[in-house]
UniProtKB/Swiss-Prot annotation:
Pfam families xrefs: FAD_binding_3 (PF01494)
Protein name per Swiss-Prot or TrEMBL: Kynurenine 3-monooxygenase
Gene: bna4
Keyword NADP among record annotations: yes
Species assigned in the record: Emericella nidulans (strain FGSC A4 / ATCC 38163 / CBS 112.46 / NRRL 194 / M139)
Metabolic or biological pathway, per its Swiss-Prot or TrEMBL entry: Cofactor biosynthesis; NAD(+) biosynthesis; quinolinate from L-kynurenine: step 1/3
Stored PANTHER family: KYNURENINE 3-MONOOXYGENASE (PTHR46028:SF2)
Enzyme class: oxidoreductase
Domain of life per record: Eukaryota
E.C. numbers: 1.14.13.9
Keywords carried by this UniProt record: FAD, Flavoprotein, Membrane, Mitochondrion, Mitochondrion outer membrane, Monooxygenase, NADP, Oxidoreductase, Pyridine nucleotide biosynthesis
Length: 506
């Protein structure tokens, strides 16, 4: 075990969230060991856990804030040189045989998110970690067991070419690792969470939505340029499905088809069904951006994967283990906050450790363990509500992206809220998207504020509608030819219109 003056921290999972945790811990003087199930993620041949490249990641203000708190500004600068700024959505459609596109800015002040490649983030983080003397990296190590009372973990070492143990029926070598505390950043199917649940009474909810996703690629133009605007998230919305495209630094676009499993089953029947589906619902994609042969080949070759969301609580056990990122709150990808929420977890976690005196140089090992337990409890108490909130927001945003972006009521509310934000900033009025993407406000607070704003707008719309209908009713009542209209019918129309206004904007 580490001496009282220095903790030994074991981190499981070498994705961006686990790497940021290593940076935070190392900066505070901890000895850090980072274990990853896969091989070195910087090696192109390393197979991702889902056997495909992932949806491009969205990096926004709160994620960048968490990176800045690591104290390594050069890492942020390196990342920001390898991302593409995204200033809004571009909605695509076709009317009367003519293709159209309509931009929707994210923010009235021109602020932006960034489209980031996961592989690039892995490279930048791991290269940085290798330069830090109190961080050790262990690839091809699978967490197989943990005792969170004795603070021990066991890993199978699955090194390439290493032979199984003699007489072990194919088992590979296993190592035992001691730690002061362990951070599980090992994704939605977290082994850390699985073993933690043997010690903690964890409420756990897992749900697969009836939507699969498949990745496609729009290549650069023959002149090595973007074929469509690189400043937007491109959306071809449908009521039950959608196709999106995010730009990459190589001038290509990483695209994703989201659709129910039943639609995928139909599209798998024949090439004709696939091409007809794209022509009907995603006009301008094929053949303008992806050739029919490439579209078909990518649909056949790339896996059709499910989407999972996870809620659980607590996120820790005693003073020995805490889970972060997707291990604690896997969210659907439709708000672009999965990475940002995970990075923010690390900032919130280490803020709690600092606040509770875990890094007080005068603390002995027992006092430090008690402080750590209090810090972990505070982290769970603070973060659970926000983790559940961004989970719910991400689910709701799927409906907005595939259908709401085309609805007049959605566009009206967005216009009004942006106008209030721009012209009357003292009111503190902002759109929900602005609060989520361009602030560090807690997700749970954002939901409460957005509901209140919706009620206010509903009341204002309702009052305005009542005034208009009342004046209209008085005018009609004074007309001899219309006085025979049923007053009850008029009252019913008034109530129906008012109810529609309130429910549509709340």
């Amino acid at each position: 075990m580490a001496s009282p003056a220095k903790q030994k921290v074991v981190i499981v999972g070498a994705g961006p969230v686990g790497c940021l945790a290593a940076l935070y811990a190392a900066a505070r003087g901890d000895d850090v060991e980072l274990y990853e199930l896969r091989g070195d993620l910087r090696v192109p041949g390393t197979i991702p856990l889902n056997f495909t490249k992932s949806i491009n990641l969205s990096l926004s203000h709160r994620g960048i804030t968490a990176l800045r708190h690591s104290g390594r500004e050069h890492v942020i600068n390196e990342i920001l040189q390898e991302v593409v700024p995204i200033y809004g959505r571009m909605i695509h459609g076709r009317d009367d045989g003519k293709l159209w596109e309509a931009p929707q800015a994210y923010d009235v002040h021109g602020r932006n998110n960034y489209s980031a490649d996961r592989g690039m983030l892995n490279n930048v983080f791991l290269n940085e970690l290798e330069r830090i003397p109190n961080i050790k990296l262990f690839f091809n190590h699978k967490l197989t067991g943990a005792d969170f009372q004795a603070n021990k973990a066991w890993f199978e070492r699955r090194l390439p070419g290493e032979a199984p143990l003699p007489g072990s029926s194919g088992r590979v070598p296993e190592i035992e690792v001691d730690f002061d505390f362990l951070i599980g950043a090992d994704g939605a199917h977290s082994a850390t969470r699985y073993h933690m649940m043997k010690f903690a009474r964890v409420d756990y909810q897992q749900e697969y939505i009836d939507t699969l996703w498949c990745e496609f690629r729009i290549p650069p133009s023959p002149t090595n340029d973007f074929l469509i605007s690189p400043s937007h998230l491109h959306i071809w919305p449908g009521k039950e499905f959608m196709f999106i495209a995010l730009p990459s630094v190589d001038k290509s676009f990483t695209c994703t088809l989201f659709a129910p499993a039943s639609h995928y089953a139909q599209l798998e029947r024949s090439t004709e069904d696939l091409l007809q589906f794209f022509d009907e619902h995603f006009p301008g994609v094929c053949p303008q951006l992806i050739s029919p042969s490439d579209l078909t080949a990518q649909f056949r070759a790339n896996p059709h994967l499910p989407l999972i969301s996870i809620k659980c609580a607590p996120h820790h056990y005693s003073s020995s283990v805490v889970i972060v990122g997707d291990a604690a709150h896997a969210v659907l990808p439709f708000y672009g906050q999965g990475l940002n929420a995970g990075l923010e977890d690390i900032q919130v976690l280490f803020d709690a450790l600092d606040k509770h005196g875990v890094y007080n140089a005068n603390s002995d090992q027992a006092a430090r363990a008690l402080a750590r337990q209090s810090a972990f409890a505070a982290y769970t108490a603070s973060r659970t509500a926000d983790a559940h909130a961004i989970n719910d927001l991400s689910r709701q945003n799927y409906v907005e992206m595939r259908w709401g972006v085309k609805q007049p009521l959605y566009r009206l509310r967005k216009y009004i809220e942006e106008a209030l934000y721009h012209y009357l900033p003292s009111l503190g009025w902002q759109t929900q998207y602005t609060r989520v993407s361009f602030s560090n406000q807690r997700y749970s607070e954002i939901i409460a504020i957005n509901r209140r704003q919706g009620r206010i707008l509903g009341a204002v719309f309702g009052s305005t509608l009542i005034s208009v209908l009342a004046v209209t009713g008085i005018y009609l009542w004074r007309q001899p030819t219309t006085r025979l209209l049923s007053l009850a019918s008029f009252r019913g129309a008034l109530q129906g219109a008012l109810q529609g206004a309130l429910t549509g904007t709340a």
